[in-house]
Amino acid sequence: MIIELADGADERLADYTRLTDVALRRRLETQRGLYMAESSKVITRAVAAGHAPRSFLMAPRHLDEMRPVIASAAGCGGSDDGGEVPVFVAPEEVLESITGFHLHRGALAAMNRPELAGVPELLASVRAGAGARRVAILEDLVDHTNVGAAFRSAAALGIDAVLVTPRCADPLYRRSVRVSMGTVF
């Protein structure tokens, strides 16, 4: 459903205003938490990977270009107005008051974190000949920008899967996702 906003203090925007990236990761842990997808390209890639949006937030000028992406998103029921998924539309100055920065990419989406396959599942698929043949491992890489760049490079090199060690920076952190241009999905 498209919801036009004139005020950034709307309670329905809590995913965008009240949570740090760390809190997004931990929030609703039973539902796998949240992450932010920023820019139409990244949102398009997240939706294409089957990630389900909680909501969209964008400037009016981006609504028409995002309608096909919204319609194809899980939970939107094929409706380009989002169906049951809120599509918040607000003027640029309201978006800036919500996010704290000029949203020059024009669109954000609060996405549910997907449940990822573990190492045993990945290895079993490799043994069965159906899984990843080229695997990269990011070990204890702590800078989010570097993690995003590593995923982008892995995609360019044709890497099939990337394993991330527990002490590695979160690949779904907003900056990692943005630097990767959505290749983390």
What are these regions (language model features)?
Residues 1-71, 168-169:
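Boundary-proximal intrinsically disordered activation/regulatory segments immediately upstream
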Residues 28, 69-82, 179-183:
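Short, conserved catalytic or adaptor-binding loops enriched in Gly and charged residues
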